């Protein structure tokens, strides 16, 4: 466990995370969090989704608050491997991820991918059924495809974008990619792959109580038929086929079956579906898209000012160290860090996006 200097010059204990799960949403992250909590080498954050680097938490809390969530019960953070799982991190922009890499350059990244149609539909079930308490069977096709079209949902399914942003920032060796199908069909192999990547002891057997646990089973939460309406299935395939083709190129054919299946589904079309697609994309979804973009422009400005506040909070006069960069950071390194954090320059810190 690392140490750093407080603003008074005293050494204080730090428990920064050594790994983070970045999604994707609806890909078994709750199940993985519960399983990893049982491993003797690992200290998970005391709540599953910290979301610190995304928006609200970072705006209202500092790094001391964040790191405190990784402390052991005795306050010493004795377990060598610490992490959090926040699937929403997969939607972060490149400039945000680059800044995380400045803070935590040795972070190990876990990413789980699920068939895009299954993932998008699972999210629809969650949002309409579990969160809104509606019977999805009674939700209109228009409402369902509008939900698919939402910017945040499309970002969660654009796996190539996520992979490129995070591997550019941390280097491709830092990123562990696996599939929801393996989690579902062979949990031991899936979990041990994660453990090896983050440096935990292997082999390790998944506790028996988790082998029969459905992964956030939305059918039990909502109580409805989970069959995807044909028009919704076609709409998702039409919307996500090109991003999935780009993903397949990046992964050198590892998701060819997804591409083939989505091409078949997309080919089964009719005029009314195509009309619905155009109306949704050019009319119905426009207000939400504009509102989303405007909100995030404002959020970026607030985050920028938040980092300025963190700088003032942790930097003392003269050559005192800055907590963000550890015990031997100087005021010069502080300025270098902050200026680098503000810049939104493209390009990898190390490595490239080849997988």
Role assignments for model-derived ranges:
Residues 20, 35-43, 50, 93-209:
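PAPS-dependent sulfotransferase catalytic domain
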Residues 58-65, 88-96, 154-162, 186, ...:
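Soluble or luminal CAZymes and related metallo-dependent hydrolases
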Residues 277-307:
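Short hydrophobic helices that act as membrane-entry/anchoring signals
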Residues 53, 159, 255-258:
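Short clusters of hydrophobic/aromatic residues that line enzyme substrate/ligand-binding pockets
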Residues 164-281:
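The conserved 3'-phosphoadenosine-5'-phosphosulfate
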Residues 11-14, 141-148, 222-231:
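Short glycine/proline-rich turn/loop motifs
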Residues 1-89, 103, 107, 117-142, ...:
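PAPS-dependent sulfotransferase catalytic core
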């Amino acid at each position: 466990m690392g140490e750093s200097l407080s603003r008074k010059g005293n050494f204080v204990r730090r428990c920064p995370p050594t790994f983070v799960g970045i999604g994707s949403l609806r890909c078994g992250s709750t199940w993985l969090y519960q399983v990893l909590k049982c491993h003797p080498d690992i200290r998970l954050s005391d709540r599953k989704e910290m979301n610190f680097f995304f928006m609200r938490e970072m705006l209202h809390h500092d790094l001391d608050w964040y790191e405190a969530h990784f402390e052991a019960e005795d306050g010493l953070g004795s377990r060598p491997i610490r992490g959090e799982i926040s699937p929403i991190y997969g939607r972060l922009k490149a400039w945000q991820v680059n800044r995380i890499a400045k803070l935590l350059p040795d972070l190990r990244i876990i990413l789980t991918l699920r068939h895009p149609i299954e993932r998008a539909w699972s999210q629809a079930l969650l949002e309409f059924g579990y969160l809104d308490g509606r019977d999805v069977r009674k939700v209109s096709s228009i409402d369902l495809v509008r939900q698919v079209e939402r910017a945040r949902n499309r970002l969660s399914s654009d796996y190539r974008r996520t992979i490129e942003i995070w591997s550019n920032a941390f280097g491709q060796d830092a990123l562990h990619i696996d599939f929801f199908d393996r989690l579902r069909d062979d949990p031991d192999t899936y979990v041990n792959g994660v453990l090896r990547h983050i440096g935990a002891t292997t082999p390790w057997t998944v506790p028996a109580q988790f082998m029969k646990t459905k992964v956030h089973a939305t059918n039990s939460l909502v109580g409805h038929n989970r069959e995807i309406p044909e028009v919704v299935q076609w709409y998702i395939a039409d919307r996500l086929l090109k991003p999935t083709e780009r993903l397949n190129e990046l992964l050198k054919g590892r998701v060819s079956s997804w591409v083939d299946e989505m091409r078949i589904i997309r080919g089964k079309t009719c005029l009314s579906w195509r009309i619905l697609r155009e109306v949704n994309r050019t009319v119905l979804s426009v207000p939400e898209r504009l509102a989303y973009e405007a909100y995030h422009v404002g959020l970026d400005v607030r985050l920028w000012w938040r980092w300025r506040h963190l700088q003032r909070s942790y930097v003392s006069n003269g050559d005192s160290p800055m907590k963000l960069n550890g015990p031997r950071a100087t005021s010069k390194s502080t300025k270098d860090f902050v200026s680098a954090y503000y810049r939104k320059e493209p390009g990898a810190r190390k490595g490239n996006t080849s997988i």
